[in-house]
Amino acid sequence: ACPDSKPSWFGFLITCREGVDKNHVVQYLESHGVQTRMLFSGNLIKQPCFDEMRKSHEGYRVVGDLHVTDHIMENSFWIGVYPGMTDAKLDYMAKVLCSAVQE
């Protein structure tokens, strides 16, 4: 980790650029033994707990159109990591990820 950083202990978040199919990448990784998990937050105001607040337009404030937040929500996923990962495992994950986006 970089100095003064606090990386996640359980996963590495990946956000696909425009033109990269997240579902294809996730399926490719999973089929090659690299486990993934979907992002579990994203644009919070689209979560069910905001249903009533959206109807009344009360209880929260939105600044801007949140297009970046929507992009992250729709195009991000986690790959699992843990402190005991070997360089060989990390290299394998990187190789599979590169292959997935080049396909």
Task: Show which residues each predicted segment covers.
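PLP-dependent aminotransferase class I/II
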Residues: A1-E103
